[in-house]
């Protein structure tokens, strides 16, 4: 949970990663790397909320080890950076609004400490079965610095550039001033300055099953990585990205809540007129685990929407306690779900969230409740309620309303009322909200939101709840219904 990834070191998104790095000098001719995730929590900053990432990393690297850099004979530990210390040291921070360009911004931003690609959705099978799914991939920078072309300087996945600079990590050892630490092979293929983690979950509503799996790896030897054009991000064989190389598209601006957007051509609920709306798409998605395999083709039904202040999503009043955050709230998907060798054709609606930054959750903040609701008729609602330790809502909580034409409207904390009417107690411990009434008078929304299954908790460390929901109620005096996803962080500790 990346970055988590959500958003990493999150004062507003990342409740920061706890990284256990064991440095061991191996008298081996080959480098053995073992990345173990004990606490992988979504370092996600969901829209403005960042997630807790507990990344338990054990990097055993030949003659070198993670956590130390040699500079003029001095050994400097990098563990403070990994654990969060001052998570922004050396990394870029989200301070002011920026210009978004697509497809470039679908790809990685290695100058920031963390980011994530987050997809959720609801699917219907031809035989009447229903599924919910989540695939999230997190990138976490271990040390700051980028190489040529704005990419990580080390030799990594397909998205990396060759070329080494000061601060490169060689065999797990940070190199200062371009000089390799004694005894470390400069050309080590295991060198990396970032790690990736992924969460996959599927809700089989008819069977009453919820299954989740996770993977983690380093950006080396093609084990994990990300690239911008054509877009692709992967951890092992879990992947999100272009099905094949696409011609580079010209920069296309996204829609921000303060900009009036022209209406989409065709029916936005059916995907007509999507050409050029989200350059770089369509994409494919693949993941499998715990007896389920999911393969989908995805095509947007609208342009990317910038959340917050033209894409700058603030989590607290502290400078840099923010992320850059955009969403594609309606994506048509179709493909297959395979369980026990039996394949079901499915189609449905998904949601993409993208965030990157270098901040973390504030000292007063405990977690967040994130809502992504897709209403019949084409509108969408996103809101993240940041929770303080005393149970109050942080005033930096915020959201976005998107009407059927694609026009977006920012929502402040005082414009959204969320009342909890039921709870669910996890067998692992922890009590989660389990039914909500969501009211947004500014857009005439008043709906009840219910999980399709009570238990949609991912037993990662830390644990969190992320699940498919139904909604029913009224919008501007008319009946309203739809589906969506809710994320609950900070309840299962």
Feature names for model-found ranges:
Residues 1, 44, 49-50, 69:
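The N-terminal extracellular segments of secreted preproproteins, especially immediately downstream
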Residues 12, 48-52, 166-169:
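Alpha-helical hydrophobic membrane-insertion segments
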Residues 48-67:
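Bacterial N-terminal signal peptides
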Residues 26, 38-42, 56, 162, ...:
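Short linear/disordered segments characteristic of secreted peptide precursors
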Residues 2-6, 70-493:
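Structured soluble/peripheral alpha/beta segments that form catalytic or ligand/cofactor-binding pockets
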Residues 10, 14-46, 253, 265:
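Intrinsically disordered, low-complexity repeat/linker tracts enriched for polar/charged residues
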């Amino acid at each position: 949970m990346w970055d988590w990834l959500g958003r990493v070191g999150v004062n507003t998104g990342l409740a920061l990663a706890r990284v256990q790095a064991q440095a061991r000098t191996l008298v081996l001719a080959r480098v053995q790397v073992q990345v173990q995730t004990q606490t992988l929590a979504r370092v996600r900053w969901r829209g403005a909320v960042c997630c807790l990432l507990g990344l338990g990393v054990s990097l055993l690297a030949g003659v070198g080890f993670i956590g130390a850099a040699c500079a003029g004979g001095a050994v400097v530990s990098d563990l403070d950076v990994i654990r969060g210390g001052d998570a922004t040291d050396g990394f870029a921070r989200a301070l002011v609004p920026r210009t978004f360009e697509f497809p470039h911004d679908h790809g990685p931003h290695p100058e920031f400490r963390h980011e994530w690609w987050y997809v959720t959705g609801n699917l219907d099978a031809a035989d009447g079965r229903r599924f919910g799914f989540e695939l999230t991939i997190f990138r976490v920078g271990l040390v700051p610095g980028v190489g040529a072309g704005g990419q990580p300087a080390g030799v990594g996945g397909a998205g990396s550039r060759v070329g080494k600079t000061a601060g490169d990590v060689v065999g797990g050892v940070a190199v200062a001033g371009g000089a390799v630490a004694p005894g470390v092979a400069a050309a080590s293929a295991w060198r990396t300055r970032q790690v990736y983690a992924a969460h996959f979950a599927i809700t089989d509503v008819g069977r009453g099953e919820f299954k989740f799996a996770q993977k983690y790896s380093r950006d080396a030897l093609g084990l994990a990585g990300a690239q911008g054009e054509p877009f692709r991000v992967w951890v092992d064989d879990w992947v999100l990205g272009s099905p094949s190389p696409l011609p580079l598209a010209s920069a296309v601006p996204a829609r921000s809540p303060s900009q009036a957007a022209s209406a989409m051509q065709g029916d936005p609920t059916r995907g007509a007129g999507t050409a050029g709306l989200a350059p770089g798409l369509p994409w494919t998605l693949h993941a499998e685990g715990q007896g389920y395999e999911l393969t989908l083709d995805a095509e947007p039904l609208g342009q990317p929407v910038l959340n917050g202040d033209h894409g700058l999503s603030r989590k607290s009043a502290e400078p840099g306690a923010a992320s850059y955050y955009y969403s594609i709230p309606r994506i048509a998907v179709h493909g297959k779900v395979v369980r026990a060798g039996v394949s079901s054709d499915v189609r449905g609606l998904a949601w993409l969230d993208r965030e990157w930054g270098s901040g973390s959750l504030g000292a007063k903040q405990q977690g967040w409740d994130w809502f992504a609701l897709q209403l019949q008729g084409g509108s969408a609602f996103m809101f993240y309620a940041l929770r303080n330790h005393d149970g109050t809502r942080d005033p930096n909580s915020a959201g976005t309303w998107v009407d059927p034409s694609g026009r977006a409207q920012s929502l402040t904390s005082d414009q959204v009322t969320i009342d909890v009417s039921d709870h669910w107690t996890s067998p692992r411990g922890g009590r989660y909200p389990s039914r909500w009434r969501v009211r947004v008078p500014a857009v005439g929304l008043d709906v009840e939101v219910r999980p399709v299954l009570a238990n949609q908790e991912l037993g990662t460390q830390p644990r969190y709840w992320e699940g498919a929901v139904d909604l029913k109620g009224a919008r501007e005096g008319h009946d309203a219904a739809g589906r969506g996803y809710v994320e609950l962080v900070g309840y299962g500790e």
